[in-house]
C-alpha cells in the first residue's frame, strides 16, 4: 500500500484506523519471519511507514514463555503502534497468547497469520492451509477476538487459497469480519504460487466488495 500524490501539495490516501490507533501514512511493513525484528523495524521507521509488524510469532511458544519468542514480542520505546503477528492451529492456545499480550501490555495491535505458504507450516495444517478447515479457522479467529476483549484490535492476513481449485479467501474474509476483526489483509496469491508470478489484484477488489457491507476494510 502506498500514498499516491498527483502533486506534492495534494493528499489522496487517507490514514488507516486500527482500533483507536491512526496509521498515518497508511503504509504497513508486512511481517516477515526472520526479517522484521527490532533492528530492521528501526531502519524502516526512519523511512516513515505508519505500522511495523513483528516477525511471525508462534502462539504456543509465547504461552510457554520461550525466551527467544518473548524477545520477538518486545519493542523499542519509540515504536508505536506496537504490532505482533501470531501463528497457531489451536484456538485455546491462540486465546491464551492473546491474553498474555493484552494483559501484559505487550502490543497495540495483533495480527493472525493465515498466509504463510512455507511447507513446514502448511504440513501441520497452519498458515495459508488453515482457512480450508472452515470450522477451525472460525474457532481460532473467534478465540483471539474474544480474548482481546476489545482492548487490542485484531486482524488477519491470508492468501487466496491453497490453489486455484481450493480458494478460501471470500468465505474466510466473511468469517473473520463477522467474528469482529478490525481488518482483513489479502496476499493475492495461492499457497501453490508461493511468491512467484503476479498478485491477483482483482481478488483484492472482490474481497473488498464482499466485506464492504460488514464495514470491515
Label each residue range with its predicted role.
Residues 2-217:
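Flavin-dependent oxidoreductase catalytic cores
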Amino acid at each position: 500500500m502506498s500514498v499516491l500524490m498527483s502533486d506534492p501539495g495534494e493528499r489522496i490516501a487517507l490514514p488507516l484506523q486500527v482500533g483507536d490507533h491512526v496509521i498515518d501514512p497508511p503504509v504497513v511493513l508486512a511481517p516477515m519471519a526472520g526479517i522484521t525484528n527490532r533492528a530492521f523495524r528501526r531502519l524502516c521507521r526512519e523511512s516513515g511507514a505508519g505500522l511495523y509488524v513483528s516477525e511471525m510469532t508462534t502462539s504456543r511458544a509465547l504461552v510457554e514463555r520461550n525466551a527467544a519468542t518473548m524477545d520477538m514480542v518486545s519493542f523499542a520505546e519509540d515504536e508505536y503502534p506496537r504490532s505482533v503477528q501470531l501463528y497457531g492451529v489451536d484456538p485455546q492456545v491462540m486465546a491464551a497468547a492473546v491474553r498474555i499480550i493484552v494483559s501484559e501490555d505487550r502490543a497495540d495491535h495483533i495480527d493472525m497469520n493465515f498466509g504463510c505458504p512455507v511447507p513446514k507450516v502448511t504440513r501441520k495444517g497452519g498458515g495459508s492451509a488453515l482457512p480450508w478447515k472452515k470450522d477451525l479457522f472460525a474457532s481460532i479467529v473467534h478465540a483471539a477476538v474474544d480474548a482481546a476483549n476489545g482492548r487490542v484490535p485484531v486482524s488477519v492476513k491470508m492468501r487466496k487459497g491453497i490453489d486455484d481449485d481450493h480458494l478460501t479467501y471470500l468465505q474466510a474474509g466473511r468469517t473473520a469480519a463477522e467474528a469482529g476483526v478490525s481488518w482483513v489483509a489479502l496476499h493475492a496469491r495461492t499457497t501453490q504460487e508461493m511468491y512467484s508470478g503476479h498478485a491477483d489484484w482483482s481478488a483484492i477488489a472482490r474481497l473488498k466488495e464482499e466485506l464492504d457491507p460488514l464495514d470491515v476494510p
